[in-house]
Design a protein with these regions (language model features):
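Walker A/P-loop NTP-binding active-site region of P-loop NTPases
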Residues: 1-47, 84
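Inter-motif core of Ras-like GTPase G domains
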Residues: 66, 80-101
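Conserved beta-strand segments of the P-loop GTPase G domain that flank and frequently precede/overlap
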Residues: 2-4, 33, 71-75, 96-100, ...
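Hydrophobic micro-sites
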Residues: 106-158
């Protein structure tokens, strides 16, 4: 499962870590792979120019999948690193972390379009750092309700 975001500081690594923790608490065998090779501890995945060593990554991923129930790949932001798209092609599924008021709708749409171009592999988005006031109307009971649907980055109420 590839976990990515549109921009930095959207909580991508925190979501990946918490997902790995939750799965391991269910007694699943989980490997959390830091594939953000711009950071020092993952630099062995990149060549001198800073590009992903695809063959090494693919072999690593194959081996990890054989030994674990889940492999969670924490990647650089999707639109800021071309190698993330290549990693998404190798992953079985992807999850996009979106922090409230961070990415512009056009950037979110671009990232989702690229992820969705890989087939049915994109599981959806994690809406992170949401303000409680935004969620409160959706948590109440009664006759008043709203449907939120449409193109990414917009919603329509009915």
């Amino acid at each position: 499962l590839l976990v990515t975001s549109v921009l930095e500081k959207e909580g991508r690594s925190t979501v990946a870590e918490n997902l790995a923790l939750a799965l391991s608490m269910r007694k699943e065998k989980v490997f959390l792979l830091n594939a953000d090779f711009r950071k020092q501890n993952a630099s062995w995945l990149a060549d001198e120019e800073g590009h992903l060593k695809i063959e090494i990554f693919q072999k690593l991923l194959e081996n990890l999948k054989k030994e674990n129930d889940y492999v969670i790949i924490d990647t650089p932001p999707f639109l800021q690193n071309a190698d993330t798209e290549e990693m998404a092609q190798m992953a079985d599924a992807s999850l996009l972390v979106v922090a409230e008021h961070r990415a512009q709708a056009k950037d979110l749409n671009a990232a989702l379009d690229l992820l969705n171009a890989q087939g049915e592999k994109n599981l959806g988005c994690v809406y992170n750092n949401a303000h409680v006031e935004f969620l409160r109307p959706m948590a109440s009971y009664g006759y008043q309700y709203a449907y939120h649907y449409g193109r990414y980055g917009g919603h329509y109420e009915r």
